[in-house]
Amino acid sequence: MYNEIINYIKNKNVAILGFGREGKSTYKFIRKHLKDKMLTVLDQNKNATSDINDDNLILINDNYLDY
């Protein structure tokens, strides 16, 4: 089942809406299987990803629901 999910998202643009418990879990899953995948996190908290050092991660927080 995991391989189906990975194959489905590997050539898609991926955005994670919200970086709470589920968002972080999703991020960790994708990073485990697709280490260089560009990801976008949309969260109202400007410090949501402050503890993550990842060059392939974009955080959008101002007006994040407009994207």
Model-derived segments and their meaning:
Residues 1-67:
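N-terminal leader/targeting and accessory segments in enzymes
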